[in-house]
Curated annotation (Swiss-Prot):
CDD domains: ST7. The lineage of its organism: Eukaryota, Metazoa, Chordata, Craniata, Vertebrata. GO terms for cellular component: membrane. This is Suppressor of tumorigenicity 7 protein. Glycans are attached at residue 47. The chain crosses the membrane at residues 15-35, 62-82, 512-532. It is a multi-pass membrane protein. Keywords: Glycoprotein, Membrane, Phosphoprotein, Transmembrane, Transmembrane helix. InterPro entries: ST7 (IPR007311). The modification Phosphoserine is found at residue 386. It is found in: Membrane.
Length: 585
């Protein structure tokens, strides 16, 4: 019964929609019939005569004023359209036409849309959740004191935005603090330090936290039950204070490494103590989770220091050990650091093994994963690749695999090739990136450009094939090929993450809609005609009459430019030019 009632309601709705479609025609004929019947009481004939007489009495100045007014209105519409397009990326009139006028004029298949919505509701919700712009911590981020601040000292430019640094402060509060920090004076100070905006205030707070730990405290624990001998202990060092000093105060990588080694001693001790007490309650469990994050962060940054200082093999070993010890902590994306270090060692077999583990359909992708896979496949054929030879004989299987890998990488992040091919200048990468955005492209190319240059012919193959990706995805914002449609929000988020002196790469490149171009041309042409008519009324009148004769005459093909100009001279009575006189010596 319920299904029958539902079917009857759907049929009734379709009948109502069908009747409304043709009811407009009925109303139109009814209005025409009423006008015809009431033509005498309404004095329609007299009104038409009055209107025609009024139009006949209008002077050319009225038409000039009317043309100027229409040009002004068109210009205002053009300015509004341009502003709306710059702000929202679409034409206002086109959007209104598509959203409101098309359903009224062309109709919409409600049944099919309802069915598609009901059947694809889950997939649409999943797509929206996946395509939502999420900002990620840059796994290859630089050191503020040793790298970012030195860039500022040399160039006078700030490489980090306030939004980016604010995200880092939130990350530090999440990773390095817990609810029980107020019980320990040093941790309480550091909890406030991570929220400080002023770098000098943060550094001073870190030094204060370390000074507190230097104070000896008497712990009244007798070594022997019936003895009066007491044990003197030192408060445990504050590992997070060393982290802050290594990140922001150290001016060289070597100084940062020394501070991180001190942080490792303190962090390892705190981690072992909290590991023994983690099952005693939720408070101890949260403290152990915090100590785990601190220890992983310290070891990862020590590996990055070794990589910066040229000890690449040592860095690889530290990263492998860290991934084995903490396999579940994927939020730091240590495998991307490992891939970059292995590429520096040219250990391509090890790189392939890491990709086989992390380039999985169930795991989130990144530019490092996609472009490293493309680099490995391009390495097998790039040294012998020639576009002329490929056009003659076609692509081999290995070349086809390399091209498909490049297309896959470009579809995921289309901004990277311009940086790898040095078509666009690089800047220092931000501390946070947006997947598939310009910020991720900068972070990848900053560290991996040297690896692409090291593989002979890889950049040439990329240069010849990367633009072919866009033929497979003509509408990247609506439908993708191997990935979800390109998210619309990347440009806005990248502008917040990247400094103002950098020109953000936009994909797909926005082109002005035809309506804006047409309105601009029509407005300019009309304004020019109005100005010429106002300044040269006689000449424009002759020109208009000549043009009307050309288009209205049956013999317009026999006319030529000479006859037109002769007629203009006769009408305006232009005097002949004076003959030049030759001066004799």
């Amino acid at each position: 019964m319920a299904e029958a009632a539902t079917g009857f309601l759907e049929q009734l709705k379709s009948c109502i929609v069908w009747s409304w479609t043709y009811l407009w025609t009925v109303w139109f004929f009814i209005v025409l019939f009423l006008v015809y019947v009431l033509r005498v009481p309404l004095k329609i004939n007299d009104n038409l005569s009055t209107v025609s007489m009024f139009l006949n009495t209008l002077t050319p100045k009225f038409y000039v004023a009317l043309t100027g007014t229409s040009s002004l209105i068109s210009g205002l519409i053009l300015i509004f359209e341009w502003w709306y397009f710059r702000k929202y990326g679409t034409s206002f009139i086109e959007q209104v036409s598509v959203s409101h006028l098309r359903p009224l004029l062309g109709g919409v298949d409600n049944n099919s849309s309802n069915n598609s919505n009901s059947s694809n509701g889950d997939s649409d919700s999943n797509r929206q959740s996946v395509s939502e712009c999420k900002v990620w911590r840059n796994p290859l981020n630089l050191f503020r004191g040793a790298e970012y601040n030195r860039y500022t000292w040399v160039t006078g430019r700030e490489p980090l935005t306030y939004y980016d640094m604010n995200l880092s402060a939130q990350d530090h509060q999440t990773f390095f603090t817990c609810d029980s920090d107020h019980l320990r004076p040093a941790d309480a100070i550091m909890q406030k330090a991570w929220r400080e905006r002023n770098p000098q205030a943060r550094i001073s707070a870190a030094h204060e936290a370390l000074e507190i730990n230097e104070i000896r405290s008497r712990v009244e624990v007798p070594l022997i039950a019936s003895s009066t001998i007491w044990e003197i202990k030192l408060l445990p060092k504050c590992a997070t204070a060393y982290i802050l000093l290594a990140e922001e105060e150290a001016t060289t990588i070597a100084e940062a490494e020394k501070l991180f080694k001190q942080a490792l001693k303190a962090g390892d001790g705190c981690y072992r103590r909290s590991q023994q007490l983690q099952h005693h309650g939720s408070q101890y469990e949260a403290q152990h989770r915090r100590d785990t994050n601190v220890l992983v962060y310290i070891k990862r940054r020590l590996a990055m220091c070794a990589r910066r200082l040229g000890r690449t093999r040592e860095a690889v070993k530290m990263m492998r050990d860290l991934m084995k010890e903490f396999p579940l902590l994927s939020m730091f994306n240590i495998h991307e650091n490992l891939l970059e270090a292995l590429l520096e060692l040219q250990a391509y077999a090890d790189v392939q093994a890491v990709l086989a583990k992390y380039d999985d359909i169930s795991l989130p992708k990144s530019a490092t994963i996609c472009y490293t896979a493309a680099l490995l496949k391009a390495r097998a054929v790039s040294d012998k690749f020639s576009p002329e030879a490929a056009s003659r004989r076609g692509l081999s299987t290995a070349e086809m695999n390399a091209v498909e890998a490049i297309h896959r990488a470009v579809e995921f992040n289309p901004h990277v090739p311009k940086y790898l091919l040095e078509m666009k200048s690089l800047i220092l990468p931000p501390e946070h990136i947006l997947k598939r955005g310009d910020s991720e492209a900068i972070a990848y190319a900053f560290f991996h450009l040297a690896h692409w240059k090291r593989v002979e012919g890889a950049l040439n193959l990329l240069h010849c094939t990367w633009e072919g990706t866009f033929r497979m995805i003509p509408y990247p914002l609506e439908k993708g090929h191997l990935f979800y449609p390109y998210p619309i929000c990347t440009e806005t988020a990248d502008r917040e993450l990247l400094p103002s002196f950098h020109e953000v790469s936009v994909y797909p490149k926005k082109e002005l809609p035809f309506f804006i171009l047409f309105t601009a041309g029509l407005c300019s042409f009309t304004a020019m005609l109005a100005l010429l008519t106002h300044q040269f009324p006689e000449l424009m009148g002759v020109f208009a009459k000549a043009m009307s004769d050309i288009f209205c005459s049956a013999e317009f093909r026999d006319w030529n430019c000479k006859s037109i100009f002769m007629r203009v001279e006769d009408e305006l009575e232009i005097p002949p030019a004076p003959q030049s006189q030759h001066f004799q010596n």
